[in-house]
Amino acid sequence: MLQQPTIRHPIAVSLGAIAGALSRYYLSLWFAQRFGITFPYGTLFINITGCLAMGFFYALALERVSLISPEIRLLIAVGFLGAYTTFSTYALDTFTLLGDRNLVAAGFYWAGSTILGVISIQIGIILGRLCGKGLGV
């Protein structure tokens, strides 16, 4: 039964999602305790590092499909990173900052998440490709 992809794939996604959601939760708590809740530092950090990880994984695994099994690709890209990164929270946080009339913080958060996210994807791709070359793949 566990040999069937129709069973293995959802299990892989689920296991990754548990780890991603818990990572997001505990990082958000840590940032709130460390820096307060007046600015969504945790969500910003999670979005940027999630983009970096997705770019790295894309370059290392998805461009070199034979390197990593489909279950591991699903576990990381769909499960872990899907649960870890949350641009819906990004939108809500921006909306909340705007509602609080904190226009400078809202503008920085909105633009910073987008610009730094795209830059982080590119850096992740470069790092993934360099790491792949170092592994001889």
From Swiss-Prot:
Keywords associated with the record: Cell inner membrane, Cell membrane, Ion channel, Ion transport, Membrane, Metal-binding, Sodium, Transmembrane, Transmembrane helix, Transport
Membrane topology: Multi-pass membrane protein
Cellular localization per UniProt: Cell inner membrane
Protein activity control: Na(+) is not transported, but it plays an essential structural role and its presence is essential for fluoride channel function.
Reaction(s) this enzyme catalyzes, per UniProt: fluoride(in) = fluoride(out)
Pfam families linked: CRCB
Chain sites annotated for binding Na(+): G82, T85
Chain segments annotated as transmembrane: 11-31, 42-62, 75-95, 107-127
Any one cellular-component term (Gene Ontology): plasma membrane
Name of the protein: Fluoride-specific ion channel FluC
GN (gene name): fluC
GO MF term set: fluoride channel activity; metal ion binding
Cited function: Fluoride-specific ion channel. Important for reducing fluoride concentration in the cell, thus reducing its toxicity.
UniProt superkingdom: Bacteria
Main location, first listed in the record: membrane
Organism of derivation: Trichormus variabilis (strain ATCC 29413 / PCC 7937) (Anabaena variabilis)
BP GO terms, sorted: cellular detoxification of fluoride
Family listed: Belongs to the fluoride channel Fluc/FEX (TC 1.A.43) family.
